[in-house]
Amino acid sequence: MPPKKKKITALIKLQINAGKATPAPPVGPALGQHGVNIMEFCKQYNAATESQTGNVVPVEITVYDDRSFTFVTKTPPAARLILKAAGVDKGSGTPHRVKVAKLTPAQVREIAQTKLPDLNANSIEAAEKIIAGTARSMGITVGE
């Protein structure tokens, strides 16, 4: 007989700094309420993201009824990549009036290529439009 499929009890989405997961909030409480071994998750997550240190890496944790878990790491949030490329700490408080930085089309393309697996875009051009829209909503202009 084939093995029984595990029943999923929870799907947890977190954004954690790469290589710096600790049992402290937000990781501890989110996993603790589902009975997951927090230290085991932290070790596995830190090992999986050690090459991306300095970025925030979203993770989707699937918890099963026997308290085991699997996780999938995503690409860093577009807003973080845009701020890093533009060299600013935060976007504009009034994005359509005050512009805080400028991105070149090459920078937008690079961010779009990084984000392409997680975006619902079929082409790099569509992904670039999504990234450019995000940048504009943060008060960052896109162009030459």
Swiss-Prot record:
Keywords: Methylation, Ribonucleoprotein, Ribosomal protein, RNA-binding, rRNA-binding. Signal peptide: none annotated. One of its GO terms (molecular function) is large ribosomal subunit rRNA binding. The keyword RNA-binding applies. GO terms for cellular component: cytosolic large ribosomal subunit. Coiled coil: none annotated. InterPro entries: Ribosomal_uL11, Ribosomal_uL11_bac-typ, Ribosomal_uL11_C, Ribosomal_uL11_C_sf, Ribosomal_uL11_CS, Ribosomal_uL11_N, Ribosomal_uL11_N_sf. Pfam families: Ribosomal_L11, Ribosomal_L11_N. One or more lysine residues are methylated. The keyword Repeat does not apply. PROSITE patterns: RIBOSOMAL_L11. GO terms for biological process: translation. It comes from the Bacteria. Belongs to the universal ribosomal protein uL11 family. Forms part of the ribosomal stalk which helps the ribosome interact with GTP-bound translation factors. Part of the ribosomal stalk of the 50S ribosomal subunit. Interacts with L10 and the large rRNA to form the base of the stalk. L10 forms an elongated spine to which L12 dimers bind in a sequential fashion forming a multimeric L10(L12)X complex. This is Large ribosomal subunit protein uL11.
